[in-house]
Amino acid sequence: HYAAQVPEDFRFIVKAPREVTDPYARDDRGRPTGTNPLFLNAHAAVDNFFGPARLGLGRKAGPLVFQFSPVPHPELRTLEARIKLFERITTFLAELRAPGDGLLLAAEFRNYELFTPRMMKRLRTLGVSPVIGLHPAMPGIRRQTEALRCWAGDFRESEAELSGESDVFVPKASGSSI
């Protein structure tokens, strides 16, 4: 048992299986073979990920990370398609939360289309931390830093941002509040 092998204050970061974070079923080489029927399925995430992680690690379970595989950019060309994916992902994350569950959830997006003010604000509302990282499929570090600052409440809201029509992060003026 891993939990017994580490200091009491140690916490494991556990990554969710791609069965719930990848829109495609894949072959042994990682090539898409079709649509993944368990993509964004909260019941599968609880049964195959949360339960085993909590049972095996107990109090030593740290952040549970959902690395969302890239969706092909052509599939996200329209505002309607981006909003639909946004709603599916945030509904999935909301379904994973239970009041007072104490779980630390984090989300990593491999599509720049999901690094929007609307997504960061919804993650904050859900108590889900964004993951920042260096990967060819992820936006540049500047965009990720802006997203993290937005998640922390450092950017102002506008109707365009909240509707999903804008993906521009606009810093708040000094002394203003959300």
Question: What feature does the model see in each segment?
Answer:
Residues H1-I178:
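Residues lining hydrophobic/aromatic ligand-binding pockets adjacent to catalytic sites
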